[in-house]
Amino acid sequence: MGSQAYRGRFAPSPTGPLHAGSLVAALASWLDARAHQGQWLVRIEDVDTPRCLPGTGPAILQQLAACGLFPDAPPVCQSRRGALYQQALDRLVATGWAYPCGCTRQDIARALAASGQARQRHGELVYPGTCRQGLNGRPARAWRLRVDKNEQKSAFAQAVQALIAIDFIANSSTGLMETEVTWQDRLLGRQHQNVSRDVGDFVLRRADGLWAYQLAVVVDDAAQGITHVVRGADLADNTARQILLQRALGLPTPQYLHTPLVLGANGEKLSKQNGAQALDTSRPLAALNQAAAVLGLPPQTGDTADALAAWVNAWKDTACRPHAPLS
């Protein structure tokens, strides 16, 4: 992909200020865009409004600016883009990809237990497809994507890019078709996930009326013309679902690069939820040097602008960064 076509983004959730871990993703996405002579956008992912803190979006932009990271277009907020998400859901419903679900978490747990499939992944129950054939008189609570709509295999085959494959395989135990997605991550290499087994039909619109992260991200990446996604490795698990949604909506798939995580003293990922300290922007170069070290980039002295310029050059050199050559 040519450098002029490149468009990347940093998409933080305003659940708290940036910390050392989120700066790694911000710096990596900015460097990748600059190394490609492309555009770098910022999107505030505030679709999960109950978790968002007032005033945090502007505070994040101020933190980025203090570190010399300025977007090439005005930032957008997901909370103002509900009409786009509704259009996407309407399309998925019309094409048979989405269906209403009346299940509560208790319903899902009971259905899994009754079938001997008490499956749980990352604290979430793997949906067994209870409402695929209808609500049986119950009111709709949420909307889900049917991940094994295998009659679309020919359409997938026509649309799939190089390094991406979507296969429909028969489960030898159940005889049911399952969907496995394979893609190439620029750092992690070949990745694959059986979405049917590991996730099940996932939520597009929640029971509380809020839009699900997966749908919002896919719609926004396409609407903003994002060609390359550079984000933390904790989000790699979302990629297969997002590729499925892109295919179902007929949208392009960006290239993906998932960066190393910053771990806390307890060995867990540094995050706002486990009390990560807000980024100290009074010493931006020190904060940037810490982030650069995680990315395998050499330390810099002097001012922030010179340091960023040096890291852009180093980013282009495969000996100085952990991922594959620019593509």
Curated annotation (Swiss-Prot):
GO biological process, one term: glutamyl-tRNA aminoacylation
Any one Gene Ontology cellular component term annotated for this protein: cytosol
Alphabetical list of Gene3D superfamilies matching this protein: HUPs
Chain positions of motif 'KMSKS' region: 269-273
Molecular function terms, GO-annotated: ATP binding; glutamate-tRNA ligase activity; zinc ion binding
Binding site for ATP: 272
Name recorded for this polypeptide: Glutamyl-Q tRNA(Asp) synthetase
Organism: Polaromonas naphthalenivorans (strain CJ2)
Gene from which this protein is expressed: gluQ
